[in-house]
Amino acid sequence: MRTIFTFILLLVTFNVIADDLLWIKLQQDPNMVVLMRNTESSGNKDGSNMLVWDETGNCVGESKLTKDGKAHANRIGEAFARHGITPLAISSPMCRCTETAKIAFEEYVTDPDLRQSASSNSQGQQKFLTRATNLLLEYRGKTPIAFVNHGPNIDSLTMELLNPGEMLVGSVNESGEVEVLGKIRIE
């Protein structure tokens, strides 16, 4: 029993140290990016309306953040503030992402090509990859980027699977590709 407790304690300590190192990189290193899915939305819970997008910005028919999702986005914003980091946020135009970005970071930029499309829509996926890469290249620099988007899109950029609200930390190279450094989880 004592061995198991010690192992768990070491594992927790290692995760805290790893998170701290990633926060330091975000504070100090250029060309950093945090890729994250939107926090919990109605669609994450029941699978409905995940591809619906109201181009007017009124969110009609779209999946929206739950109460827990809004609270989680707020905790993410607080974590960035505690570490003295004010990122430039880039968001999918779909409401669950713009809500996450607005609550966590207040201001954000968006583009219609950053939305989620059906996995069978290879043209939509290619538009996303091209636009995301161009935006990462355009905004890479001293200020870290917070890229709020959808699981399938982040997976296509990084080959990493994320849970809602989980954050993937990386650096953007000269080609606009993301070199993954690790994950930060804020409960």
Regions found by a protein language model. Give the residues of each.
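Positively charged n-region of N-terminal signal peptides that target proteins for export
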Residues: 1-4
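Active-site-proximal flexible loops/turns
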Residues: 9, 45, 157
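Charged, low-complexity C-terminal accessory regions
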Residues: 124-164
